[in-house]
Amino acid sequence: GDEISVYAWTGDATAAPETRERVVNNAINKLTNGSWISTPQMLWKNNRDKHYFIGVYPISAISDLSAGEYTFDVTKQTESDLLVAINKDGLSYNVDEQQPVPLTFTHVMAKLVVNLTYKNQWGTEGPTVDKVAVGNAAKKATVNYLTKVVTPSAVASLCPDGNGFDIGQLF
């Protein structure tokens, strides 16, 4: 039941066009019985030009693939990883064969999980933890989906002592 957004265009591999000029614009591909089913159906522009593809998880309507806004959604923490796949070599359509589009996803932002465990040096109950501080935790960012570069635009508030971020503010 996973779903990804797929975008495709022709022309320059390093510059995705505006929404209206894309060959595929946010086609939602859902994993169904081991196959990806696209809505709407993805079609090739022609069989001459190379087509370039980007896949994004979770699904997202992105108007500017070189500067897309991303906001961490605290209500969907289990789906909070941001994965991106780019097919920058380009593919051309061949009418005589099935044409799968290889997309290998990598994390550009990931959920942080902190599990504190203690041995018995503080007794069976363990210590009381007031806070856990984490550095460089982004709540919002601008993502260049073409290069997978993430630029934080908002970070969690610093702890009062100025060291790291209060985990409670992130989740």
Language-model region placement:
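Short, low-hydrophobicity acidic/polar segments
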Residues: G1-G135, S157, D166-F171
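Acidic/histidine-enriched alpha-helical segments
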Residues: V134, K139-K140, N144
